[in-house]
């Protein structure tokens, strides 16, 4: 077997492989003998049919099949011998082939990029320094009260904290538009659900009031046909309701399944907030470390890996919205391509960190991660036992641990500082 390697643009490689004719003929003849031995032919006893007849009937099809097998086998032998690492399946194309002659074919594919990590000492990470304070717990308890609130008609004007039920009809240049009309629409004032200026027009109004307001749709509004448009809304206030908050007592506590009365609920709420806070802090640090890693290391990405990741994201999108899995390929590629490329880049770079640092999943870290995750459930012991009895779940958790160890390795070389921040400020930050 003769092999030549041609480097194309980027990560593309082309192998030209020559396979001796004898290899092809041996494979074809072996299969024809197998057919002659095991198939029945009219007028012949089993295994007694002449080989020329078998070759005439099946030679072409067998030769075609065996060519594919031979190309696949010799491609694998070639990349193993030359230590080539393909990033996806090759595309085979025969260059020269005639019966009794050597087979010359090409295999076109992409390789994994050679990654040399750099700039880890230039990665900047700001660790949030935050704790759950008594006032944070009190605010969360107040949120729970609001979630359990009841509403009742009141002879009051609409203002923040009340709920106005309205009818409205919207128009642009005198024409009604889709989604611009509603009856008995409940609007909790002060929540910012409507476009800017809409709630302001209703404030101070009472049940039975009619009004007309003029507002502008934001330039970044989700509906393309409404972006930046000036609109007029005719509004009727049907009723205004006041919110009645429940008392913070044992009856209220039982709705949340907490033990130990009001103090028990406070303890449980604080515990949940601290667990959520710890995860958020970890995610913020990880996000900065990965962003810095990507910024400092510009690498080529095999399109084959992006294609694979696009398919994964398509399937996840279909599952998330309850669609038919068969419809996944119909989702436009451009919806996922940028995210897919990012995930491939991050995977390759973290993989190189793991390789360079010679990291292996730490058993104690795996155990700690499982216990941390299980603590959010009613029976943590049962959850831990489930993980420990499921090898696939354990492997998933080992991968999580390995990724965290890679992040720790980045942080060990990065420029890390600390910044004090409030609980709500941190929890309400949008991902970068």
Curated annotation (Swiss-Prot):
Compartments it resides in: Cytoplasm
Domain called PPIase FKBP-type: residue spans: 161-246
Any GO molecular function = protein folding chaperone
Q: Which Gene3D superfamilies match?
A: 3.10.50.40, Trigger factor ribosome-binding domain, Trigger factor, C-terminal domain
Instruction: Note the PANTHER family from the entry.
Output: TRIGGER FACTOR CHAPERONE AND PEPTIDYL-PROLYL CIS/TRANS ISOMERASE, TRIGGER FACTOR-LIKE PROTEIN TIG, CHLOROPLASTIC
Q: Give the family from UniProt.
A: Belongs to the FKBP-type PPIase family. Tig subfamily.
Q: What is this protein called?
A: Trigger factor
Q: Origin organism of this chain?
A: Aliivibrio salmonicida (strain LFI1238)
Its gene name is tig
């Amino acid at each position: 077997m003769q092999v030549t390697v041609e480097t194309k643009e980027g990560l593309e490689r082309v192998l030209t492989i020559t396979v001796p004719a004898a290899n092809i003929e041996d494979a074809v003849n072996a299969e024809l003998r197998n057919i002659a031995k095991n198939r029945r032919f009219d007028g012949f006893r089993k295994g007694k049919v002449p080989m020329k007849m078998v070759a005439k009937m099946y030679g072409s099809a067998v030769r075609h099949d065996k060519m594919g097998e031979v190309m696949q086998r010799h491609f694998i032998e070639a990349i193993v011998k030359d230590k080539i690492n393909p990033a996806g399946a090759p595309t085979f194309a025969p260059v020269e082939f005639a019966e009794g002659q050597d087979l010359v074919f090409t295999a076109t594919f992409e390789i994994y990029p050679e990654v040399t990590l750099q700039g880890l000492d230039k990665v900047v990470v700001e660790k949030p320094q935050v704790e759950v304070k008594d006032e944070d717990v009190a605010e969360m308890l107040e949120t729970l009260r609001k979630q359990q609130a009841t509403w009742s008609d009141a002879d009051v004007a609409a203002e923040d904290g009340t709920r106005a039920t309205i009818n409205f009809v919207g128009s642009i240049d005198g024409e009604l538009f889709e989604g611009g009309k509603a009856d008995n629409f409940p609007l909790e004032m002060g929540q910012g659900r409507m476009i800017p200026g809409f709630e302001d027009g209703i404030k101070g109004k009472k049940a039975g009031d009619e009004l007309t307001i003029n507002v502008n749709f934001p330039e970044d509004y989700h509906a393309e046909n409404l972006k930046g448009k000036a609109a007029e809304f005719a509004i009727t206030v049907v009723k205004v309701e006041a919110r009645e908050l429940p008392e913070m007592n044992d009856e209220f506590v039982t709705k949340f399944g907490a033990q130990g009365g009001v103090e028990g609920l406070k303890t449980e709420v604080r515990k949940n907030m601290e667990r959520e806070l710890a995860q958020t802090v970890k995610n913020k640090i990880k996000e900065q470390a990965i962003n810095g890693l990507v910024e400092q290391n510009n690498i080529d990405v095999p399109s084959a890996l992006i294609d694979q990741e696009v398919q994964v994201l398509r399937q996840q999108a279909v599952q998330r919205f309850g669609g038919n899995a068969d419809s996944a390929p119909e989702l436009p590629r451009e919806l996922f391509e940028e995210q897919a490329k990012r995930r491939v880049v991050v995977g390759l770079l973290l993989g190189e960190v793991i390789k360079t640092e010679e990291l292996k999943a730490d058993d104690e870290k795996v155990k700690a991660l499982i216990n941390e995750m299980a603590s959010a459930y009613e029976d943590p012991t049962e959850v831990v036992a489930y993980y420990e009895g499921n090898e696939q779940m354990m492997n998933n958790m080992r991968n999580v641990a390995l990724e965290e160890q890679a992040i720790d390795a980045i942080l060990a070389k990065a420029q890390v500082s600390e910044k004090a921040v409030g609980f709500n400020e941190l929890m309400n930050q949008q991902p970068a």
